[in-house]
Every structure is written in C-alpha cells, then in structure tokens.
C-alpha cells in the first residue's frame, strides 16, 4: 500500500566499476492481505478466503526478474540514482478461483518492474536532490545533527538535519511545538521522518514529526471493519514499534489481521496533521477529540498504543486493547475526476476496502505553495493540482469522515502522485 504514493529507500552502492549494467530484483514468499470482492471463494496457497472476507496469505512465489527495458551506464566519478516501479497488479493472477503470484510473467504479459533514472520528471525537488522518502516511522537515536530512525519492519534510516529541516508538533501537541528546532528531538521517541535522497546517496531530513515521547508498543494498520456498539474495530497491520522492554507485540507481524478494543476510558482521539492546516476544516472534529469507534471508518489508517495483547488462535484474530488512537495516512489509488484546481481534487472508484459506492465522488483538499515547503502537498509527476489529468492518481491523505459519509472535503492530501 505504501508504495502507491510513496517511495522506499533500498540503499546506496559505492565504488561501482565503469560499465553497462542491468537491474535484477530478488523476491520470495510474498505475504498479501486482500479483500475478496470477487463474489466467490478464492483459494490462495491452500487457504480458503470467503467472498467478502479480508484474508492474509503467504505465497510460495519466488523470482529474480531482470528489467530488460533498462540499462545503466556507470562512468568514473559519476553519481546516479535509479528508481524501480513495482506493479503488483501485473504479478497477480486469478484462475479458476485460485490466486497466484508470478514475479516474472511470460511475454506478452506486462512486466512487474520498470526502472528509470532519478530525479523523475516533475518530481518537484531541489538541486542535488534525487527523491523524497516519506513517513519512515521508528525509534529515534541522535548524534549531533544526525537523526537515526530504527524500524523493526523497514530497517534503519540515517539522515542529517539542516537549517532547512522542519519540525512538526506531535499529534497531542506536547512535543516539538510551533517553530521548534532539532533541540526537541530526543532519543527514544517514536517519530516519522521525511528525508531527501541526495545525489551522493546520503539523506537529509526534510521533516521530523514525533508521534510518542517514549518507545512503547505502537501498531499501525488499515481499518477494514468497525463495530461501534462494542467499541471495536479490525485492521490489517502495516507497521509497528515495540516497547524497549517487556513488549507485548513481539509475535505480531505486518500483514497480520488484528482486533482493536478501545479502552473503557480512552484518551480523546488524535489526528496526525503533519504540518497541514487540517484543524481549520469542519471535518477535523469528526475524529479529533472523539472517543467512540463510530468516528472510525474502513479505509482509514490508524495507529494505536497497546495496553494489552491476546495472541491469535486458529479461529480468532489477535486482539489488543488501546487507550490512544491516532488517525494517520491512508494511501490509495483512485480515478481523478475533473475539474482540477490547485486546491481541490475530486476522486471516485476508491479501493473496495473503503466499502463505498464506486461512482461516489469525494473531495480531496490540496495545500498549494512553494514545492518542498512546510504544510504543502507534495506532488509527483505534476507541478501542482491544476496539472492533474483524468488518469489514476495515488494519494496519501487523512481520511476524515462523518457517520453519514457526507464530509466535504473528506480527504486532506500530503502527497499526490499522477500516473
């Protein structure tokens, strides 16, 4: 889900001999979480997935596809960046009710990977910037102006803070208040970082946002079911951070399905605004300050602090109790619908796990301004919202909705990628 709108950093290579190279990718044992919206039961690696169910399966597919359409010519003392585009749709097939994955489908089927050099056209980056890595979440350590974020699910990101780096306040407003500097960054915080990939392969902090003051059990996921009568919802786990000691969630993995029980007296819900002026919208209160599961909707991404944990069994999902629920960033691909302006984008045909009528249109709030500025929507492939064309767009946005599904706007975009 993350790579629909965002980019992951795979690393930097040094001392590459001069020559011409192809790119080969090694993949194995993919875990896939999906909503079976086909109307019939699906079988995946021997596991049955009923119609209308959300299922998590690990497949045995493996492969080392070579991206034949791309070659890299390395010369002495040159610095180059390469980006890979992974098209999961081209790897998945459904035949006679059986779901399978092939990372190297035979011609004339479309390839799973394409590659290109960086920076991309209309990437809206500055001098010596190749790409922007966004929302890398983990535990903070600090050495001078160098910030390290360690994630149990995504590895480690090391980036240098500069005078151009932004520091957003935490969702509860207690950490890094307005006009903060790196002095508000403390070891042991849970934080989200955006970082520029520089032409020399190093990373520079664009934006730092603390999420928790201390390292504790913290789980993020995509909501797919809500029961407001029982103060309960279900989600697919997309990220986690474990407490420094005595973690309850060591056996919980990304891709697992999880039941979340809201505590009897929870903290008022928070919204991770990431510097966007979301608070000024009437939609903000649909989530912020609430304490009931009725404020939560399928398709939202939320983070929860874990106070109790019960492991999964063969018949029941793993379950946690949480006293703190924070709205974070939904990532999805949808159809862009005209008209397009610098401030508003209309979309329909959202993914089926939102459980919304495909033809229904929803308004996405955009935040125009100087590219790379604080509180501004990042655009990839277009200069601003007025350049959007009626093709699919991938969006990372806050989803703020009411019980009648009439919020306008319903989405507040930190990122828009034009396809």
Predicted regions located by residue number:
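A short, solvent-exposed, low-complexity linear motif enriched for acidic/polar residues
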Residues: 1-231, 236-241, 250, 258-260, ...
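Intrinsically disordered, low-complexity segments enriched in Gly and acidic/Ser/Thr residues
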Residues: 232-235, 325-382
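Short acidic/His/Gly/Ser-rich catalytic and metal-binding motifs that mark active-site loops
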Residues: 244
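Eukaryotic compositionally biased low-complexity/IDR segments
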Residues: 251-252, 359
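C-terminal interaction modules of eukaryotic adaptor/scaffold proteins
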Residues: 365-369, 377, 385-410
